[in-house]
From Swiss-Prot:
GO biological process: translation
Native organism: Brevibacillus brevis (strain 47 / JCM 6285 / NBRC 100599)
The protein, known as: Small ribosomal subunit protein uS9
GO cellular component, one term: cytosolic small ribosomal subunit
Family assignment from sequence similarity: Belongs to the universal ribosomal protein uS9 family.
Length: 130
């Protein structure tokens, strides 16, 4: 018998997360490591758990994640987006709650490109009057 799995892909900044929800006891595994060892900051762990807490499905599914690209904040946001999409496939009734919380919306904010003549995207070289 095939095991029931729900897939979701999440993106944030330059990170892409492929998320699988498997009925289980609530373990969250990111790149074959437990979430507690993968993310050091408590805020990042909270970001990942937000859709599960909102929909009250925290202990119902094991979350298996493959994530690459970007930094820790981008990866946490991508995982949150992917978990929300996977939960939607598991139970379409949750769409309203997830949409209101903004978890189904891809965050469009990206790093601004560096411009020539400047040191960074907007940082100008030091101005000398004389």
């Amino acid at each position: 018998m095939a095991q029931v799995q729900y897939y979701g892909t999440g993106r944030r900044k330059h990170s892409v997360a492929r998320v699988r929800l498997v009925p289980g006891e609530g373990r969250i595994v990111i790149n074959k490591r437990e979430m507690d060892t993968y993310f050091g900051l408590e805020t990042l762990k909270l970001i990942v758990k937000q859709p599960l807490v909102l929909t009250e499905t925290l202990g119902r599914y094991d979350v298996l994640v493959n994530v690459n690209g970007g930094g820790t904040t981008g990866q946490a946001g991508a995982i949150r987006h992917g978990v929300a999409r996977a939960l939607l496939k598991a139970d379409p009734e949750l769409r309203g709650a997830l949409k209101r919380a903004g978890f189904l919306t891809r965050d469009p904010r990206m790093k601004e490109r560096k411009k020539y003549g400047l040191k960074a995207a907007r940082r100008a070289p030091q101005f000398s009057k004389r």
